From Swiss-Prot:
One of its GO terms (molecular function) is RNA polymerase II transcription regulatory region sequence-specific DNA binding. One of its GO terms (biological process) is anterior/posterior pattern specification. The modification Phosphoserine is found at S12, S69, S306. This is ALX homeobox protein 1. Pfam families: Homeodomain, OAR. Keywords: Acetylation, Activator, Developmental protein, DNA-binding, Homeobox, Nucleus, Phosphoprotein, Repressor, Transcription, Transcription regulation. The lineage of its organism: Eukaryota, Metazoa, Chordata, Craniata, Vertebrata. Acetylated at Lys-131 by EP300; increases interaction with EP300 and stimulates ALX1 transcriptional activity.
Length: 326
């Protein structure tokens, strides 16, 4: 009697006529069977529940809760009493079986690589087609004439001028603005090119290098000057210094040279740079050699030989000045 009072909180103490009364030496199984068969509802309430849900079948065993994954064991109902033959439990079992099949079967329905490439190409084509394409405008001669007239007046027309010009040329104001931008860029390019050409012409006029000997004339000079193999050298008797020089240098005699002399001449030429030689030339007279060989008296030959002699004298004078300064 004390056992039942401690384990079950009853509203009233059990009586001998009740099913829950267990006398001395009574069995506990009888009490548990009585609890299983009892509906725990009153008569009125039990009738309503039977009409709404139907008779509840007897549970044969208690629910076994498993802690494993629901995809591995289909008997887990998460606290819902498993009753055999009930539609709700049947649907749950089918769902669990489908989960097991999905877990064990390979993944299907995924697109292949070729399909993904095709989808990417379609997306790229859609993006490129959605971009605004630029159309090149072809201007007529009348339109270009009107545009050039305005450009001669001003390179930066305002909005009002552009609108009036667009009405006359039957173009949009945006097209007219773009044309003026391109025309200004073209004009600036031509201006830069003209400045470069002007600088080149000014340099050529300032530094006249037409009188300097050319490299292709060296063999001719060698053949004409040093054809005769003589022991004596020619003597330069005239003064070939600038006109404002106060005195003349002593005559400079030179002997026949080999090709190395012309190499030194080219070095001296590079040292002095492009210097006008018109002022260095005066009336020069070249005498013949001891064996009777005379130089040619052609003007071109005299000019070339005089320039060579002047450059050699300038090189010698420059060397003397450097040695005197040291």
């Amino acid at each position: 009697m004390e056992f039942l009072s401690e384990k079950f909180a009853l509203k009233s103490p059990p009586s001998k006529n009740s099913d829950f009364y267990m006398g001395t030496g009574g069995a506990l199984e009888h009490v548990m069977e009585t609890l299983d068969n009892e509906s725990f509802y009153g008569k009125a309430t039990a009738g309503k529940c039977v009409q709404a849900f139907g008779p509840l079948p007897r549970a044969e065993h208690h629910v076994r809760l498993d802690r494993t994954s629901p995809c591995q064991d289909s008997s887990v109902n998460y606290g819902i009493t498993k009753v055999e033959g009930q539609p709700l439990h049947t649907e749950l079992n089918r769902a669990m079986d489908g989960c097991n099949n999905l877990r064990m079967s390979p993944v299907k329905g995924m697109p292949e690589k070729s399909e993904l490439d095709e989808l990417g190409d379609k997306c790229d084509s859609n993006v490129s087609s959605s971009k605004k394409r630029r159309h090149r405008t072809t201007f007529t001669s009348l339109q270009l004439e009107e545009l050039e007239k305005v450009f001669q007046k001003t390179h930066y027309p305002d909005v009002y001028v552009r609108e009036q010009l667009a009405l006359r040329t039957e173009l949009t104001e945006a097209r007219v603005q773009v044309w003026f931008q391109n025309r200004r860029a073209k004009w600036r390019k031509r201006e830069r090119y003209g400045q470069i050409q002007q600088a080149k012409s000014h340099f050529a006029a300032t530094y006249d290098i037409s009188v300097l000997p050319r490299t292709d004339s060296y063999p001719q000079i060698q053949n004409n000057l040093w054809a005769g193999n003589t022991s004596g050298g020619s003597v330069v008797t005239s003064c070939m210094l600038p006109r404002d020089a106060s005195s003349c240098m002593t005559p400079y005699s030179h002997s026949p040279r080999t090709d190395s002399s012309y190499t030194g001449f080219s070095n001296h030429q590079n040292q002095f740079g492009h210097v006008p030689l018109n002022n260095f030339f005066t009336d020069s007279l070249l005498t013949g050699t001891t064996n009777g060989h005379a130089f040619e008296t052609k003007p071109e030959f005299e000019r070339r030989s005089s320039s060579i002699a002047v450059l050699r004298m300038k090189a010698k004078e420059h060397t003397a000045n450097i040695s005197w300064a040291m």
